[in-house]
Amino acid sequence: MSTAKLVKAKSSELIYTRNDVDEHTKTLTIKLLNELVIQFIDLSLITKQAHWNMRGANFIAVHEMLDGFRTTINDHLDTFAERAVQLGGIALGTAQLVTEKTPLESYPTRIHSVQDHLKELADRYGVVANFVRKAITEVKDEDSADMFTAASRDLDKFLWFLEANLENQ
C-alpha cells in the first residue's frame, strides 16, 4: 500500500488510520484531547514561571516540587497529543493557539512570594483538574478516558499539595 493512501484525508478531514473507533467518536475525542493539549502546555509554562521566580519561606521545597509537577504535566501532554494523532487528528499545540484558546487566566509576572505563586498556581490547577474530570465523563473513547483519569489523579494530588502549602486559603 502506498504512503499516499495511508495519509489521504477523508471528507471528515481525519487522517486515515486503521483504528476502528467510529468517526464521530474520533472527532469529538480529538477535540477534547486538543483542548487538554492547550491547557497542559499553558499549565506547564505557568508552573515553570512560578518555579523560576518565587522567593521566600519554603522556597527550595516548593521549587523542587514544581519540577516534579512539570515533568508529569509534560508526560500527560505528550500522551494527549499522541492520542489525537493516533485517532487520525492533528495535535494542535503552537504558542499562538495556546495564547488564543487557553481558558486559564493570564499568569501574573510581577509576583515573587512563594505564597502568591502557590495561590495563583492552585487557582489554575483547579481549572484544569475540573475540566479533565468533566472530560472523563464526556469522552466515549475508553482509552482516552483512561488517560484523562490518570491525569485527573495527578492533578488532584498536585492541587492538594499546592493547597496544603498555602498559609491562608
Swiss-Prot record:
Its EC number is 1.16.-.-. One of its GO terms (molecular function) is DNA binding. It is found in: Cytoplasm. PROSITE patterns: DPS_1. During stationary phase, binds the chromosome non-specifically, forming a highly ordered and stable dps-DNA co-crystal within which chromosomal DNA is condensed and protected from diverse damages. It protects DNA from oxidative damage by sequestering intracellular Fe(2+) ion and storing it in the form of Fe(3+) oxyhydroxide mineral, which can be released after reduction. One hydrogen peroxide oxidizes two Fe(2+) ions, which prevents hydroxyl radical production by the Fenton reaction. One of its GO terms (biological process) is chromosome condensation. Keywords: Cytoplasm, DNA condensation, DNA-binding, Iron, Iron storage, Metal-binding, Oxidoreductase. It catalyses: 2 Fe(2+) + H2O2 + 2 H(+) = 2 Fe(3+) + 2 H2O. It comes from the Bacteria. The keyword Oxidoreductase applies. Its main location: cytoplasm. InterPro entries: DPS_DNA-bd (IPR002177), DPS_DNA-bd_CS (IPR023188), Dps_gammaproteobac (IPR023067), Ferritin-like (IPR012347), Ferritin-like_SF (IPR009078), Ferritin_DPS_dom (IPR008331). Pfam families: Ferritin. Fe cation binds at H51, D78, E82. Homododecamer. The 12 subunits form a hollow sphere into which the mineral iron core of up to 500 Fe(3+) can be deposited. This is DNA protection during starvation protein. GO terms for cellular component: cytoplasm. Belongs to the Dps family.
